[in-house]
């Protein structure tokens, strides 16, 4: 009986001596994932990354967890934010409609939260790794507002060594939209001129004014805004540059006029193509009606002209920032 008792005691002692002791050497590194104002383009496909930001861990070789011998530990990457719901491809939906978040780390082991892996060592660091936040468009219609503040993720080998959070107003989502009144396609009849009205390359004649009318909704939070920008493009007329605003005659066949295109004018100046033009700013939950007045006229771009029809296409693009 005494031998049996002694044997059990020795076995227990041997088991205890095999255990490693690990402790947290330094407090967790913390990241405030501030990205400021993030504007969502209405034309962005569902599943696209709206915005992304990567943080590099400090290159100071800080040891966050220490063990008294080589030890195998399980490292967990967890999402701890309240109210987030995991969806497909580890994208978490937020309280803002159509807006999702994806969290990831890259280093010796790359992972998308939530995830885990085992690693062996006596000291555990963050140096050489990065943390990335992707903001994802999860539905066709997106809302606006500020992402909730508080803790979002935790990572570490048995002890938390990396934390991420958002402060108040750290990320504001802006989902503006503009509707072109009258539809996306517009036909402008610029009338008729005589061939003799054009006096040579670089001269113009005739023409008519036309308006592009927009109804724009800010769809932003109290602290948000959105700039509305437009750009114009088309096939440039021969021997002209983008700042002359002259479109090639795309009419073909025997009925097409030769050497004559269409010049577009804005504010009494040729409209520069492929350039961003700011046409307004939307404030909090504001709806604005914007009219963009333009003028189209005939323009001679070649030394030789002929009578006939002129047909050109102008492409109008809207962007937000």
From Swiss-Prot:
Compartments, as annotated in UniProt: Fimbrium
Gene3D superfamilies documented for this protein: 2.60.40.3310, Fimbrial-type adhesion domain
InterPro entries per UniProt: Adhesion_dom_fimbrial (IPR000259), Adhesion_dom_fimbrial_sf (IPR036937), Adhesion_dom_sf (IPR008966), Bact_Fimbrial_Adh_Pro (IPR050263), MrkD_recept-bd (IPR054160)
Family: Belongs to the fimbrial protein family.
Signal peptide: 1-18
Lineage start: Bacteria, Pseudomonadati, Pseudomonadota, Gammaproteobacteria, Enterobacterales
Primary residence: other
Gene Ontology CC, one term: pilus
GO biological process terms, semicolon-separated: cell adhesion involved in single-species biofilm formation
Gene encoding the protein: mrkD
Record has Signal as a keyword: yes
Presence of keyword Protein biosynthesis: no
Swiss-Prot/TrEMBL keywords: Fimbrium, Signal
Protein's name in the database: Fimbria adhesin protein
């Amino acid at each position: 009986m005494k031998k049996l008792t002694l044997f059990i005691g020795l076995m227990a002692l041997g088991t205890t001596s095999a255990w490693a002791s690990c402790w947290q050497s330094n407090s967790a590194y913390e990241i405030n994932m501030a990205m400021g104002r993030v504007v969502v383009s209405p034309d962005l496909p569902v599943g696209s990354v709206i915005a992304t930001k990567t943080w590099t861990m400090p290159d100071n070789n800080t040891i966050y967890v220490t063990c008294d011998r080589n030890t195998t530990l399980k490292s967990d990457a967890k999402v701890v934010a309240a109210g987030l719901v995991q969806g497909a491809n580890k994208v978490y939906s937020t309280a803002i409609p159509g807006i999702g978040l994806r969290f990831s780390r890259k280093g010796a082991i790359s992972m998308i939260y939530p995830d885990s892996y085992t690693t062996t060592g006596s000291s555990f660091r963050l140096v050489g790794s990065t943390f990335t936040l992707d903001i994802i468009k999860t539905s066709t219609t997106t809302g606006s507002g500020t992402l909730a503040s508080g803790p979002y993720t935790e990572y570490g080998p048995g002890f938390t060594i990396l934390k991420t959070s958002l402060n108040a107003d750290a990320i504001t989502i802006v989902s503006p939209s503009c509707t072109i009144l009258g539809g996306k396609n517009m036909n402008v009849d610029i009338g008729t001129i005589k061939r003799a009205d054009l006096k040579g390359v670089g001269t113009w004649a005739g023409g008519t004014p036309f308006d592009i009318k927009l109804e724009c909704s800010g769809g932003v939070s109290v602290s948000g805004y959105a700039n509305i920008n437009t750009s114009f493009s088309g096939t440039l007329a021969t021997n002209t540059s983008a700042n002359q605003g002259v479109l090639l005659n795309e009419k073909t066949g025997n009925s097409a006029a030769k050497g004559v295109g269409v010049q577009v004018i804005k504010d009494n100046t040729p409209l520069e193509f492929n350039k961003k033009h700011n046409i307004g700013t939307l404030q909090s939950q504001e709806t604005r009606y914007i009219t963009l007045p333009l003028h189209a006229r005939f323009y001679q771009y070649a030394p030789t002209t002929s009578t006939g029809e002129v047909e050109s296409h102008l492409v109008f693009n809207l962007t937000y920032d």
